Amino acid sequence: MDLGWDRSRGPRRSTSSVRVRELSWQGLHNPCPQSKGPGSQRDRLGEQLVEEYLSPARLQALARVDDLRLVRTLEMCVDTREGSLGNFGVHLPNLDQLKLNGSHLGSLRDLGTSLGHLQVLWLARCGLADLDGIASLPALKELYASYNNISDLSPLCLLEQLEVLDLEGNSVEDLGQVRYLQLCPRLAMLTLEGNLVCLQPAPGPTNKVPRGYNYRAEVRKLIPQLQVLDEVPAAHTGPPAPPRLSQDWLAVKEAIKKGNGLPPLDCPRGAPIRRLDPELSLPETQSRASRPWPFSLLVRGGPLPEGLLSEDLAPEDNTSSLTHGAGQVLCGNPTKGLRERRHQCQAREPPEQLPQHRPGDPAASTSTPEPDPADSSDFLALAGLRAWREHGVRPLPYRHPESQQEGAVAPWGPRRVPEEQVHQAEPKTPSSPPSLASEPSGTSSQHLVPSPPKHPRPRDSGSSSPRWSTDLQSRGRRLRVLGSWGPGLGDGVAAVPVLRALEVASRLSPRAQGCPGPKPAPDAAARPPRAAELSHPSPVPT
């Protein structure tokens, strides 16, 4: 028994002991861990770690080349919140140009420290707040960082090879920041348009801006080696632009910043992200293992990827401004405002979203009866229109009877002839009376005037309007007056088909009225002529 060991209390204090236990394991005491196969969780974790950065295999797959030394231009749209770029510059030794327009970069330090040979860098609309880390690009000659939130230009003083600098639409508001660019001896082209420094030399209220402030002349003094300023020769220091125009231009620059494809830094993690690459349109809520890598790589001379630019950056939102807050002040009755907004939304609806008539719809077929040419009033207009056009007489405006039921559809609505088309198709009547020609036959020498119907239509208040009957009577009187001018004109105007159609139209058929109708009047041609009908006016001397 070990003297330094007490079974009840464990090892005693102030005593040391060594216990050796013999193992019954016959194999190695420290065996190597065994793998469960290619689809194990460990392998998936390893693949995920490889996808976290731009590995050589990943770059080769994107560039579609086996030798990465052939890649001279790399264009990517990245989001460094999802994954690190790693030290990818080590695998691209001949990379000269790097395009990251529309990406989301927290800092330039995310690019790594292996791009010392890079000469051209595009960083437009990347959400950059500063240029910290740009000192790791000593060979940089051209920097395009427009539409960001850069206000500090001090890191640029370390770029001795810099020749072109584009800072359009940023937040430079102090001429003291422009002074740092004096340390760039080769700087020849500078763009500061869209910055607050164009309106005032220092931050502060606009009412304290020195009178006659000309920022072009001030920048020219600070950077004497400058040749081009805002795409205009730096030697041209003309009068400054009106303040109002410059402020409007600044508003346009801010709108361009907000139109970036990627959300700003303060975007919530659960919100979906719209990327410029169609392969990257997955929401952030998905797992990282199922997300594709947000890169698109181009070799010089290769085609641009499809869908590089977003088509719909700001879709229209029909929700109320009160939902998102920061809306206009609501004054007056809120119910009235909601009704007006509903009308505006309905007015903006495209025609394809409105309900359309379907031929097979049972509801529409039951509510709209089939038209019948025999008992429809439009048959009058279609039957007599040819006779009106042949003789060049302009008819009276055609009116449909008003429907008594609210919301009812006229049975002959689709076949209605517009008055404008009738007037355009008909030749104009001459102002002078037409010449009266002799009748070709004996029967046509007699001027026929229709007699009133023997069985007048019964008065029915629920079937038609009194205005319709008055209209027919006025047409009949007009035909009789025109017919009294002479046999020649009467033969054309008061033709038998037209008068017969007027006589039939003066009463409605049983199907139109919903009740048994009167018997039709005998034909005018079969009826023996009366004495009044055989008389015709005296001929007009020619």
Swiss-Prot record:
The organism's place on the tree of life at top rank: Eukaryota
Extent of the LRR repeats: 94-115, 117-138, 139-160, 161-182, 186-206
Segments traversing the membrane: none
Any one GO cellular component localisation term in the record: cilium
Major site of localization recorded for this protein: other
Residue span, LRRCT domain: 207-250
Region of interest (Disordered), ranges: 308-377, 396-475, 507-542
Biased composition (Basic and acidic residues): 416-426
Compositionally biased spans, kind Low complexity: 522-532
Biological process according to GO: cell projection organization
SUPFAM superfamilies for the chain: L domain-like
UniProt KW keywords: Cell projection, Ciliopathy, Cilium biogenesis/degradation, Disease variant, Kartagener syndrome, Leucine-rich repeat, Primary ciliary dyskinesia, Repeat
Location in or out of the cell: Cell projection, Cilium
Binding partners and assembly: Interacts with IFT88.
Annotated disorder: Ciliary dyskinesia, primary, 39: A form of primary ciliary dyskinesia, a disorder characterized by abnormalities of motile cilia. Respiratory infections leading to chronic inflammation and bronchiectasis are recurrent, due to defects in the respiratory cilia. Some patients exhibit randomization of left-right body asymmetry and situs inversus. Primary ciliary dyskinesia associated with situs inversus is referred to as Kartagener syndrome. CILD39 inheritance is autosomal recessive.
Protein family membership: Belongs to the LRRC56 family.
Function of the protein: Required for the assembly of dynein arms.
Protein name: Leucine-rich repeat-containing protein 56
